[in-house]
Structures are given as structure tokens and as C-alpha cells.
Amino acid sequence: MIKRTLLAAAIFSALPAYAGLTSITAGYDFTDYSGDHGNRNLAYAELVAKVENATLLFNLSQGRRDYETEHFNATRGQGAVWYKWNNWLTTRTGIAFADNTPVFARQDFRQDINLALLPKTLFTTGYRYTKYYDDVEVDAWQGGVSLYTGPVITSYRYTHYDSSDAGGSYSNMISVRLNDPRGTGYTQLWLSRGTGAYTYDWTPETRYGSMKSVSLQRIQPLTEQLNLGLTAGKVWYDTPTDDFNGLQLAARLTWKF
């Protein structure tokens, strides 16, 4: 899995300069679930390129999900396009496909619209369609706002989910980002809570449960071109059949051109 990711990163780095390549990232993500819920390993390579008013992202991921008695492997490819139409309108369009396993969502499409209608304020709305393992489909509509106050960015997002077999649910997410006084480093905290336990790791019993999570990330510049990202988080699931939690640890290296 790691070898495939490093190979993809090597291929990406060989792209010609005229493609507008701005960064290459290689990362690893590990989640350990309590009880007999196993663990999840994910390695990925990602590139970002700039073409006039558009920013393009390409990601190739390899994942493994280990349960107590079952094991699944999967590959996922995804892409996204951010387009700046003018000074107040930006859109994000994303699509992803993966193997039909519990590791990733099989299909994922999202469309976000960002509106800078007020000074130091960004409004966001969007739609997301996801098809999980075993043909479970989820439609999600979200809306939020971000406030820019000096080095601090505070964001709130509400999401409503409509599942093909579990009905409606929701989630609330708050994030606070503190930019370093100098350089490009920053620290970001996420807090979320809701009744829609929909994640890429699709576990059937979470369809009818609730969840809450906390995650802390540090982006630390090592040189002018190389950044190190470290993330630690925890999620708690409360389901009709079992209560359990997951501990997440992640690391990534990003080279900027």
C-alpha cells in the first residue's frame, strides 16, 4: 500500500512544469476502533495544479479495513476543481470512485458554492451524493459561514442527510483555525456532533446512531517548500447495538513548487 503511494508520488513529480503544478503530498492515516470494530489504514498521494482561474486536485488512495474476522482492501481515485468566477463567487466540484468495499464510499459527488458577500465573511452552500458499500445511498445538503478575524478563521457548518434506508439525520461542525504570525503554518481544531454517522468507513450499525468527534491538526513548515502535517482525533459512536470510539492519527508531507 505504501509502495503504491510512493510510486504515484514519483509519477506526479515527473509532470512537466507547464502543467501548473503547485504541490505534491504523500500521507498516511490510521484509525483504531475500540472493542471488536478493528482498524483502518489509508495511504495516499495527491497533487494540486493551477490553470488560470481554476485549481485542480487529484488524489489516489489505497486503504485497508480490518474487522474482527473480515478484511477488505480498496483503491480510490478522486478529483476536484475549484473555480474563481469573480471576486465574490467560487465553486468546488468533486468526484470520486472506489472499489465496492467498506473501506471507501463507492461513488462520491459534491458541488459547493462559496459566496463572499460581506467583508471578511464567506458563506457556503452545497450538495453531496454518496453511494456506500451494499448500495446505501445518502444525499446531503449543507450550509455554513466562515468569519475571518485577523489570524483566526472561525467556521460553522450544518448538514442534513437523507439516507436510502435510514431516513433523515443531521450534523453540526465548528472549526477554529489559527494562522502563525509568520510563514504558512497554522493550527486547526474541529468539533462536530450529530445523528448522521455517515463516514467513508461504512459500518451498518452506525446508520441509526449518533456521533461526536474532535480533531486537532498542525501544519508545520520545515523549509520554504516542505510542510509537515500532523493530525490527532477521536470520534464517539452511540448506536442501538453498541457504543464505541475511534482514535485517528495521521501524517503528511507536502512539497510546494
UniProtKB/Swiss-Prot annotation:
According to its UniProt entry, this protein's organism is: Escherichia coli (strain K12)
Predominant location: membrane
Please state the span of the N-terminal signal peptide per the UniProt entry.
Answer: 1-19
Domain of life of the source: Bacteria
Which Pfam families does the record associate with it?
Answer: YaiO (PF19413)
Q: Which UniProt keywords apply?
A: Cell outer membrane, Membrane, Signal
Record-level GO cellular component terms: cell outer membrane
What is this protein identified as? Answer: Outer membrane protein YaiO
Localisation per UniProt entry:
Cell outer membrane
